[in-house]
A protein has these predicted regions:
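Pre-Walker A-like glycine/lysine-rich segment at the N-terminus of P-loop NTPase domains
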Residues: 1-42
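Phosphate-coordinating catalytic segments in nucleotide- and nucleic-acid-processing enzymes
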Residues: 47-174
Length: 174
């Protein structure tokens, strides 16, 4: 579980530390950094030369994302005081200590969704995923439709059908 996140020099942040609980809500006015917190977490699990450009997010070059108001020379993101990623555009360098994606499982669903289609893609490489833009949602639903959900804490009404598909139907009909 992610308990603490420290962000230095990224966008609106000079240096800030967040503590997380089992359920954490990010709320506030526009342009206060809510999206930046999510982007920092995604940058920690995204692979490549620029962790801000890839599968989960594509928000720009490191030089564009540094906090210009305080003259940040680098961006540093730390999770749980254990996993660190430092990025500088001077040498186009990313230095990582530890690999967060080995410790936690992330299912990120972007607010940007694909529209209605006549057909939907199939994930051949990993059929047990939904896709960042929910492009494999129908495949995932079909694969897990009859998965048993007895004694699952996510079940709201025990009188509903206690399968994954039954729970999806229950919430879509509400």
């Amino acid at each position: 579980m992610i308990n603490e996140l420290t962000i230095k020099g990224l966008k609106c942040f000079d240096e800030v530390e967040f503590s997380f609980e089992n359920l954490t809500l990010l709320a506030g006015k526009n342009s206060l950094g809510k999206s930046t917190v999510i982007q920092a977490l995604l940058a920690m699990i995204q692979e490549g030369k620029n962790p801000f450009r890839g599968q989960y997010i594509n928000i720009g070059r490191i030089s564009e994302l540094k906090n210009k108001y305080v003259g940040s020379k680098e961006i540093e993101i730390t999770v749980n005081h254990k996993f660190v990623r430092r990025m500088t555009d001077d040498k186009n360098e990313v230095i990582s200590e530890g690999k967060l994606s080995d410790e936690i499982s992330v299912r990120y669903l972007s607010a940007d969704r694909i529209g209605v289609r006549d057909t939907y893609e199939i994930a051949l490489d990993n059929p047990d995923r939904i896709g960042v833009r929910c492009e494999y949602a129908y495949q995932y639903l079909a694969m897990h439709d009859s998965d048993k959900w007895e004694n699952n804490p996510l079940v709201f009404d025990q009188r509903s059908k206690l399968t994954f598909g039954g729970q999806v139907d229950y919430w879509l009909e509400r």
